[in-house]
Amino acid sequence: MNTIVKHTVGFIASIVLTLLAVFVTLYTNMTFHAKVTIIFGFAFIQAALQLLMFMHLTEGKDGRLQSFKVIFAIIITLVTVIGTYWVMQGGHSSHL
């Protein structure tokens, strides 16, 4: 895909995802937790879109290796965040 076309598609998709998040927040009667879940979903999709369209993650001869590095970093981040939350909740509930 041409670079200009790729950047244009990525830009338009990012704007659409942002507007969808604004619409969900302002114009729906969903619960707070449902809104946050949907917005986080849009955020993760937009982050992946940014990596693929603008950061050229999969391009070049090391594209596949870069993809594995990003996936590994995401897994480490999730383990750290979820593990920290789990430990904090366990410590908080044992003190009550």
Swiss-Prot record:
Which molecular function term from Gene Ontology is one that the record holds? Answer: proton transmembrane transporter activity
Tell me if Membrane is a UniProt keyword of this record: yes
Q: Which reactions is this enzyme annotated as catalysing?
A: 2 a quinol + O2 = 2 a quinone + 2 H2O
EC class, as a word, reads: oxidoreductase
Give the record's keywords alphabetically: Cell membrane, Membrane, Oxidoreductase, Transmembrane, Transmembrane helix
In terms of one coarse class, where is the protein primarily found?
A: membrane
Transmembrane spans: 8-28, 36-56, 68-88
Write out the function statement from the record.
Answer: Catalyzes quinol oxidation with the concomitant reduction of oxygen to water.
| Protein known as | Probable quinol oxidase subunit 4
Q: Which source organism does the UniProt entry give?
A: Staphylococcus epidermidis (strain ATCC 35984 / DSM 28319 / BCRC 17069 / CCUG 31568 / BM 3577 / RP62A)
